């Protein structure tokens, strides 16, 4: 490969390394405080509110949202709530308020009628 083609490639690689060094590392795992980070929508502003759980107030966890790191209310149990494609039949009342009210690995999630109940999460 000619040297004239290597110069732009080297410049791009150097720029990439500099950008990586500018972003503070984020644990993203939230291992310091109980619970797990919820599934968050990507924040295009690349907000860096925290680097670790201890940077967040009270029970909030430092969680990744795309290129951002924000303090967020944690989920108590692993997994995410399944999507609801259509209204489902069943009891249309709230059967739980938080994951800890659900047995085993089940989570407290929205059901088909706008209320919440214990369901098997997606992993």
Curated annotation (Swiss-Prot):
The gene is WFDC2. Residues 1-28 form the signal peptide. Glycans are attached at residue 45. This is WAP four-disulfide core domain protein 2. Pfam families: WAP (PF00095). Disulfide bonds join 37-63, 46-67, 50-62, 56-71, 81-109, 92-113, 96-108, 102-118. CDD domains: WAP. Keywords: Aspartic protease inhibitor, Disulfide bond, Glycoprotein, Protease inhibitor, Repeat, Secreted, Serine protease inhibitor, Signal, Thiol protease inhibitor. GO terms for molecular function: aspartic-type endopeptidase inhibitor activity; cysteine-type endopeptidase inhibitor activity; serine-type endopeptidase inhibitor activity. GO terms for biological process: antibacterial humoral response; innate immune response.
